Structures are given as structure tokens and as C-alpha cells.
Amino acid sequence: MKSFKLTKEEATMLVQKYATPLEVISLEHIEENYNLLCKHIPRLKVFYAIKANSAKCILEKLIKLGSNFDVASAGEIRLLSKMGVSGEKMIYANPVKTIEGLIEASKVGIKRFTFDSENEIDKIKKYVPDAEVL
């Protein structure tokens, strides 16, 4: 893997051009890291947590690579759905799921859910009766 480093001068030039705050993303490194995980742990299914960084370019790259996604809100579900990601490629993993989120999950066909309490299981069952709870 190639190193990705910015010199102080390069960073200063970027700030002058784009202002702050500034986020510099290496899509090449995202792809390399994704492929390394898949190569060395072949049974692994990658679920990228949108909350980590929802930059459109990152999501587009991961969609192209075939990634799955960890969603935590109705907004994240809608975002991925608009980008063409099916519910089969998502897991709803929020310790306290909203009713809006569960309804949206049911609409797009999300079947996999995590839970942290018995109350969450009851809520999931009510709004997504055919859910798979992990």
C-alpha cells in the first residue's frame, strides 16, 4: 500500500483553496483497505458504518466495491436507498431505534437488526415482524 501523507505546504495550499474545515479523503486507500479485508478474511462481510463518514464519494466507492452498510437512522436508510442500495445490503444497528427508522427499514426491506435490550426486540417485532435479530 502506498503511503498517503500531505506536507505542511500541501495542506496549507488546500486550506487556502477550499477553506476550513477541510477533509481530505483517499478513495484509493479506501479501496485498498476494503480489498485487503475481503482478501485476507474471505468469509467476512463488510458493513460500513455510515455514521463514521457519510461523504458521498466514500459511499459511492463502497457501493461500487459491493460493501454492505450499517445504518442507524431513517435518514441514513433513505440516503442509501436513494443511491440504489437495497435493504438486503443494510443492517440496522442502533441501540435505541426510532419508530420512524423501523418503518423506513421495513419499507426498504432491511431484515437484519441488532439489539441491546428486550424492549428493542419487542419494538423490532412490532414494526418489522419478519426481522432477523442478531
Spans of features found by a protein language model:
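A charged N-terminal "starter" segment
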Residues: 1-113, 118-132
